[in-house]
Amino acid sequence: MSHNFTESYDIIVIGAGHAGVEASLAASRMGCKVLLATINIEMLAFMPCNPSIGGSAKGIVVREVDALGGEMAKNIDKSYIQMKMLNTGKGPAVRALRAQADKELYSKEMRKTVENQENLTLRQTMINEILVEDGKVIGVKTATHQEYAAKAVIVTTGTALRGEIIIGDLKYSSGPNHSLAAIPLADNLRDLGFEIGRFKTGTPPRVKASSINYDVTEIQPGDEKANHFSYTSRDEDYVKDQVPCWLTYTNAESHEIIQNNLHRAPMFSGIVKGVGPRYCPSIEDKIVRFADKERHQLFLEPEGRDTEEVYVQGLSTSLPEDVQKDLVHSIKGLENAEMMRTGYAIEYDMIMPHQLRATLETKKISGLFTAGQTNGTSGYEEAAGQGIIAGINAALKIQGKQELILKRSDGYIGVMIDDLVTKGTVEPYRLLTSRAEYRLILRHDNADMRLTEMGREIGLVDDERWARFEIKKNQFDNEMKRLESIKLKPVKETNAKVEALGFKPLTDAVTAKEFMRRPEVSYQDVVQFIGPAAEELDEKIIELIETEIKYEGYISKALDQVEKMKRMEEKRIPANIDWDDIDSIATEARQKFKKINPETIGQASRISGVNPADISILMVYLEGKSRSISKNQAK
């Protein structure tokens, strides 16, 4: 078929949400000519649900995006109204930052970045069709019948694919926040032969701030201590006049209202068909599933400095509007609250992620990538993490360079993508610290140490950023060496100091590092014995040093496991393997292998339903094939 291409790009990104902006920025910064197409420019990097960035596991993803050279961390550092470090009373593996965002400012700042980015064109247009020839992407077609050529296309449409909003018995075609739904593109993806799923998510009502009685709620302030998502942000720019959130609860009256109206709840009446998120259920779902709970937490979260809208986190619902009003008014502090927006559920199409490679390129069509909620995930942070990887790999493919695959030991982004492409998902996927087996080495405080070098190699970390990173890394390395080299001896003078600090005296000579392994001994305590470092150390470097030393034994075990898995990941499986040619593997394993087509032995071993015996048989088969090929080549 001949095409009348009016414009030509290296990469076209469809959708300008959190995945789309990261994908387009990464690819354009790598030198590709990129078109970022969106149904509505006003909704670029918009937050249709919660007005926040970060949280458990998610905050670490934001730092990983930043370390690779992405934008989300920098953008939230320019637009937050509250910053808080979570889980400070727990171990370092689960600590993470969370920021309350000024949602309008967040979108505005990101738009400014996108509009000023070299090689990147932003355009409001609806893409109806992805053009494919001989199994390869060649471009797209718009609703206005314009055809644009492209070497790669990245689909980041979020919840817009055949989106439908549901409130009570009302159901209508819509994308997020009542924007247009992408119906022709959804049809096109089906026609291209992709297996499509149907998921659901939801959002709570918004209430007017001046109508809330805050006196009967519990204040939730931000942190006074400076913290940032981006490693480029400075402590002196930390916002001091932060806006608090407030805590309240549902009660017996709230639960009775919901119980009495379950017959009108789309979740239970059969109107909602899509699968909802397990870890962010609607309030009506919570009341049914956790009937023994007397109350549920609700956080009142301001949506910005210049708006009266307050997001009622924990009250996601698609109940009819009249029921929502009664429900809101049953809650302490909201007795007279004005509802500014009604909560709703949204159903949407998504691509079942087992059809993707770990680069986020589809297996079916060369040059077609997908990222974000299109792949079955939930959350802005998960979307951004996939977006930057899709953008990087689309650019690398076009440039004929080696693809980037983040391993599970590299970061939470690697964990998420591996989970999606290896295990698939039957519900909106959310990142949790429990999903990461190497979480002690995937911490919020070492994301830059893990990924900045990758970002530099790809071309997303500039000279200034790299110079700052090298200074930090050198300071860290030098101080660790110093702590390993200086010995504390059990002499009278030293032990007098040790006991004065309230610690048990030394019985043997130990290095400063060994002394610091004691749970009660801090870096600052050790400095009293060995003096300060040659250069003054930033507080965050000290935190990193303490964590690495105090958890060294656990970290060492984790790194040993990583090495074992690395060897399995290096054993590649040929793309043209005939799974029916392998004798003795279990039927379930054969079926899963055919469906997922794992690329490495490591990936094959993580597929549910595949046991160690199947992996052993597969390895014997591959070794036999390899020997056979070697013999034939030797003849």
From Swiss-Prot:
Entry cofactors: FAD
GO cellular component, one term: cytosol
Keywords of the record: Cytoplasm, FAD, Flavoprotein, NAD, tRNA processing
SMART domains membership: GIDA_assoc_3 (SM01228)
GO molecular function, one term: flavin adenine dinucleotide binding
Compartments, as annotated in UniProt: Cytoplasm
Positions annotated to bind FAD: G15, A16, G17, H18, A19, G20
Assembly and interaction partners: Homodimer. Heterotetramer of two MnmE and two MnmG subunits.
Role summary: NAD-binding protein involved in the addition of a carboxymethylaminomethyl (cmnm) group at the wobble position (U34) of certain tRNAs, forming tRNA-cmnm(5)s(2)U34.
Family membership: Belongs to the MnmG family.
Protein name, as recorded: tRNA uridine 5-carboxymethylaminomethyl modification enzyme MnmG
